[in-house]
A protein has these predicted regions:
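A short, flexible N-terminal coil/short beta segment enriched in small residues
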Residues: 1-20, 29
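N-terminal [4Fe-4S]-dependent radical SAM core
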Residues: 1-3, 142, 146-187, 556, ...
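Glycine-rich beta-alpha loop elements in corrinoid/cobalamin-binding modules
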Residues: 2, 18, 25, 32-161
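Residue-level recognition of beta-strand->loop/alpha-helix junctions
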Residues: 7-9, 36-39, 62, 330, ...
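Proline-aspartate-enriched helix->loop->beta-strand connector
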Residues: 55-57, 226, 354-355
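Radical SAM enzyme core and accessory elements
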Residues: 2-6, 44, 57, 107, ...
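Radical SAM [4Fe-4S] cluster-binding motif and immediate context
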Residues: 166-320
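A structural motif corresponding to the C-terminal lobe/cap of the Radical SAM core domain
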Residues: 240, 252-255, 261-268, 272-438
Length: 583
């Protein structure tokens, strides 16, 4: 009996926690399924080839919002070339309309609904027993499935009771297959909140994995020095003792390499947790915080509990530690959130200066409260995944398109981290930073820039063009701010054409490095190098403005040390060497 678990991931670096967990569960019962992982960017032909040549008796496919269309196409064609293979689907994208799926695809054997660890194991054993002529549970006795019986009739069994999370088998015994990929880990399941747009709100039965077991498994990741472990817990810190124990453990066993990502509710963070977080190695932890909106009416309508004042306090206090990457989320298209309201929400969250500001758009998921109340909100969304909002009674499609442009500009100019010093100077021109991103998005559209790909330097050039033509700003000043940002990121091999001619300070630069090679006062970590090597390994730039301060007219000499970098931005350490440079 050959059973294959199939996943179609969004990117190669992603791994599918579900199929590996199901595999581990089945192996405990003496069934050894294989795994085939693909990505949404692979050709259908290559996926079909891989599955066909496996000659499977049973194929089970994991279905999510990002892959369901591909999966539907794949199984339709696969059934044609392997008609005897039993095809099962599972996952959140099929659990809530299983009967409809079986009617739509008459070749499907069944759908696994809800938690699949035990369900899949019982299905795998069922088919193995069939092959070996052994007795055991029939499909009629397996909870958590909708299936087709021997006569072709669609039958639905009761949903399976949720299981103890400590009984879930660890799927990462062999880490070789996960090299250069993100490890996903689950220490709890369920969510204490009832956000109307989220499927996690359906399962309010919070269950936690035994902490001793969690520590043992995290120790394994740390020993293996995996690059990143991403916790998929919906609200990691909803139980303080659980969160504190894990954070303390990874702090005490930090290997200097592994990074841990957590999704948290910032307003639940306590003083004790804050104190611990502020002691962590820079880069050890990333925090993702879903704000979604700061409109009180919207927050109430989506059944979300959030004290934005507390969120602001916590995010700011974490930011002061300069050791934790913070990723904040907003969602456009929620009830009572019109364009003006979203503009205010954006300004509120942008003011917190997270390392990443994610602008998402409401996705209307089957099974969610929002799905059941679309008529009430006059909410119209795409018929196919990702089921993204098109318009609501508060947000017309014209405004959705504008917000799409803002999203793109934020991604390019803020989240890229390539304009860290330039953006604050531009923001001085605006009452609300949202307006800058909107105007820049309009400029991209008007010039046709949105239709083409642009390299890094071109992004700077377009921004300069915008500031000159649309804002009538001092181009010389912003050129120098952008030169600062460019060299902060890397020691440029090709000098940007809009930078000043460095021959203006050639002699002073040589004198500076010769003196530094003698004194080692500013670059002590370069003790093994002579002055010419220092000059190549670092960068010295003369500015006509106070680029690290007020932006006022003032000569500043900045030394970029690429051996020392900011743990959050990745930018080189910048040293003001103005004093005595021209002496």
């Amino acid at each position: 009996m050959k059973i294959i678990l199939t996943a179609v991931n969004a990117k190669y670096i992603h791994s599918n926690l579900a199929v590996y967990t199901l595999q581990a569960s089945a192996e405990k019962a003496g069934v050894f399924p294989e795994i085939r992982e693909f990505t949404i960017n692979q050709s259908k032909d290559s996926m079909l080839r891989s599955l066909f040549l496996a000659h499977a008796d049973v194929v089970c496919v994991s279905c999510y919002i990002w892959n369901i269309s591909i999966v539907e196409d794949l199984i339709t064609e696969y059934h044609k070339i392997s008609p005897k293979t039993k095809i099962w689907l599972g996952g959140p994208e099929v659990s809530y309309h299983a009967e409809e799926m079986l009617e739509q695809y008459p070749f499907l054997a069944g759908i696994m609904k809800g938690e699949g660890e035990v369900t899949f194991r019982e299905i795998a054993v069922y088919y193995q027993n069939q092959e070996n002529g052994m007795e055991g549970k029939t499909l009629e006795e397996i909870h958590g499935i909708t299936y087709r019986d021997a006569d072709g009739a669609v039958k639905s069994n009761p949903w399976r009771p949720v299981m103890d999370r400590s009984e879930v088998d660890f799927p990462y015994a062999n880490l070789k297959k996960f090299e250069n990929r993100i490890i996903y880990y689950e220490s709890s399941r369920g969510c204490p909140f009832s956000c109307s747009y989220c499927l996690s709100s359906i399962d309010k039965r919070l269950r936690f994995r035994n902490l001793d077991l969690v520590k043992k498994e995290l120790a394994f990741f740390l020993e293996q020095k995996v690059p990143q472990v991403k916790f998929v817990d919906r609200t990691f810190n909803c139980k303080k003792d659980h969160a504190m124990a894990i954070w303390k453990f990874i702090a005490e066993h930090d290997n200097g390499v592994t990074n841990f990502h957590f999704e948290i509710a910032a307003d639940l963070i306590t003083e004790e947790e804050l104190e611990l977080l502020n002691t962590l190695r820079p880069g050890l932890v990333q925090l993702e915080i879903g704000v979604q909106s700061t409109n009180p009416q919207t927050i109430e309508a989506i059944h979300r509990k959030m004290d934005f004042g507390k969120v602001t306090e916590i995010v700011n206090r974490i930011a002061k530690g300069r050791n934790i990457h913070q990723h904040l989320d907003l969602i456009a298209g929620l009830p009572y959130e019109d364009y003006a309201s979203f503009r205010r929400s954006f300004a509120d969250v942008y003011a917190l200066r997270p390392q990443q500001l994610q602008l998402g758009f409401l996705k209307v998921l089957r099974g969610s409260f929002m799905y059941e109340h679309t008529k009430e909100y006059d909410c119209h969304y795409q018929e196919r995944e990702p089921y993204e909002v098109l318009y609501t009674k508060w947000l017309p499609y014209d405004d959705v398109l504008k917000l799409k442009d803002v999203e793109e500009m934020v991604e390019v100019y803020y989240n890229s981290g390539q304009f860290v010093h330039t953006l604050p100077m531009i923001e001085r021109l605006y009452e609300n930073p949202f307006d800058f991103f909107q105007e820049l998005g309009d400029f991209y559209r008007a010039k046709g820039y949105s239709e083409a790909a642009h390299n890094r330097i071109q992004r700077y050039e377009i921004l300069l063009e915008f500031l000159r033509d649309e804002k009538q700003q001092d181009e010389a000043f912003f050129r120098q701010m952008m030169v600062l940002d460019l060299y902060a990121r890397e020691n440029m091999k090709t000098r940007p054409h809009f930078a000043k001619d460095p021959s203006e300070w050639k002699n002073e630069s040589r004198n500076f490095y010769q003196k530094e090679a003698e004194t080692r006062t500013l670059l002590p970590s370069y003790a093994a190098y002579d002055w010419k090597q220092l000059q190549r390994m670092t960068h010295l730039e003369v500015f006509d403005y106070d680029v690290l301060g007020s932006g006022e007219k003032a000569r500043r000499v900045i030394l970029f040390d690429y051996q020392k970098r900011d743990p959050l931005t990745g930018n080189a350490e910048m040293i003001d060497c103005s004093s005595g440079f021209y002496a």
